[in-house]
Amino acid sequence: MSREVTSGLPQDKPTGSAPPPPPPWRRWLLPIGLLVSLVLLFTFPMRPSSGKTLTYSEFLTALHHHDIKTITIHSDGEASGQFADGRPYSTTIPIGLAGSQLLNELENNGVQISARPPGPSLASQVLAGVLSFLPFLLLLGLFAYSGRRAGAGFLAGLPGIGRARAKIFTTERPQTRFSDVAGYDGVKAEIAEVVDFLRSPERYRRAGAAIPRGVLMVGPPGTGKTLMARAVAGEAGVPFLSVTGSSFVEMFVGVGASRVRDLFEEARKHAPCIVFVDEIDAIGQRRAGAGTIVANDEREQTLNQLLAEMDGFEPAQGVVVLAATNRPEVLDPALLRPGRFDRQVTVPLPSQADRAAILRVHCRNKRLAPDVDLDAVARATPGFSGAELANLVNEAAIAAARAGRRDLTAEDFRYARDRIILGRREDSNVLLPSERHAVAVHEAGHAVVAACSENADPVERVTILPAGRALGVTFQLPLAERHLYSESYLRDSLAVRLGGRAAELEILGEASTGAVNDLSSATELALRMVREYGLSPRLGPVSYPVGGSMYLPGGQELTPRPYAEATQQRIDQEVADLLRDAEERARDIIRRNRQAVDELASLLLEQESVDGAVVYQLVGRPVPTPEEHREAAARHVRRPGIAAATGASMAGGSEPRTAASSDDLL
């Protein structure tokens, strides 16, 4: 059973029959009465006391005795002023008598005369008062409407603002099981072991083992961390509390720490249990140092409370915290130490075998045509996460439905892969004839250089059909999973990326802006070879990694440069030399295989897409096989003097995408 936690004191239920509720209109009487009173108060303010009230005869008598000093005549006949001794008075001048004769008499007696223009009418005063209170009325109505929609008014929700927004699963659990999580056998074993700790604690206590306090799952987005938590909730025989890290953040100070306390109080009531915190980096970021100018006291208070609850003076017994994040580098070290998060489980991008298993799970309720080989689809999608594979199957199903078929074909999966990587395809006729020829030459250059390079990934397909910003694409697929990249492989990769530009220079006589994406990716790879991988003889075996997220590519932290300006100049020179050497190698391959490039460009103009086997036939080389790849890989790894980029691939821990190169549309 799933319910929302808003813990508090239990309320006694009435035993007798409750009186009937008042009619709805009565609850509006008091607010309307107060509003009318305020309107009248501000519309008709009390006039100050006007002193002694005189009749018109008494006023004339005082005027003749020179007792009147000033007079102010109103448009409605009312008059007020001061006596000679300064006392105020008021009187009413009859209509028709406040003429020139009275004015002459007032002037003859030395009275200072003033007049007041007519004021607004009663209706206009009431209207002005209502309009002045209209914003207040609208705001009051908005609060009333929101309160009715939420089941309680704004003020009614304030007492529970410090309560944790956690969902508790006790009896009715999610339908997800570990069998629904394909692949990741090691990760599932670690997570299942924690569940077994809580199911059978005595077995571990007899061996002297302590139950881990926390398990942190880290990995790129879309790899199934939250899915793994849902599987734990479905498999666990203990209560499961689920909450997101952002739910602790609120506009009121102290609310985050209060919600952490309330969450663990609720967890202790259900112990033994599991607390799952998704996106824990929202509250677990590293605290500011002593000299830091910018700090977030509210977030740090929330983090401090979380640290105390997990392993403080009174730690939570029988409560295991399961958390997930794709930004482990920003978490506070105190949160990651043993005793809080005893285990860190990495959920990486799936391997080829894992991708095949994930595809089989998502294809359970779909009909596949005989030509569909899910192992081949898995090999064609290196670097895809579990979420992207689910999207791949869904896009293939959409393509089949669009064509009026129930069975998913291999072409549907190829279309879905291209759409995810590149975007929606366009017709090549959108290009000018000269542009279409330039794109064909460009892609032919990529394909021929890749086919003639010993260490490059094999060419799978070449196309000049525009998709997204790409005007053409050369697809390369590795024959096996790569975990280390040798220097020879990286240098051949540079030559392949610059092969399109080299073909333009050799055949067309000039380069174009279509190579901008190739230049960008080649420069980035060369920079990492020199600065991070230690593959520069001039710079030596040093590594200056660029700060940024481990699993979120694209962002870079503003960190101080750990080397001198002279070192930066050497890095720039080495990068330029690597790129020049790669371009010269690519141009040499194009010159030696000019006929193959011309024939492939003609085939692309005619067919728009050419299979990789045709490319190898044109250059006179056999299509690479997995056995040849394994022999070559073993030969390159054992070769002396060849350095490998250890610890991470050239994509920062993830496999490269299948689209090796593309023309960019500017």
From Swiss-Prot:
Residues 641-653 have a biased composition (Low complexity). SUPFAM superfamilies: FtsH protease domain-like (SSF140990), P-loop containing nucleoside triphosphate hydrolases (SSF52540). Keywords: ATP-binding, Cell membrane, Hydrolase, Membrane, Metal-binding, Metalloprotease, Nucleotide-binding, Protease, Transmembrane, Transmembrane helix, Zinc. Its EC number is 3.4.24.-. Residues 1-23, 626-666 are annotated as: Disordered. Zn(2+) binds at residues 442, 446, 518. ATP binds at residues 219-226. Its main location: membrane. The chain crosses the membrane at residues 28-48, 126-146. The active site is at 443. It is found in: Cell membrane. GO terms for cellular component: plasma membrane. Residues 1-27, 147-666 are cytoplasmic. One of its GO terms (molecular function) is ATP binding. InterPro entries: AAA+_ATPase (IPR003593), AAA_lid_3 (IPR041569), ATPase_AAA_core (IPR003959), ATPase_AAA_CS (IPR003960), FtsH (IPR005936), P-loop_NTPase (IPR027417), Pept_M41_FtsH_extracell (IPR011546), Peptidase_M41 (IPR000642). Acts as a processive, ATP-dependent zinc metallopeptidase for both cytoplasmic and membrane proteins. Plays a role in the quality control of integral membrane proteins. This is ATP-dependent zinc metalloprotease FtsH. The lineage of its organism: Bacteria, Bacillati, Actinomycetota, Actinomycetes, Acidothermales.
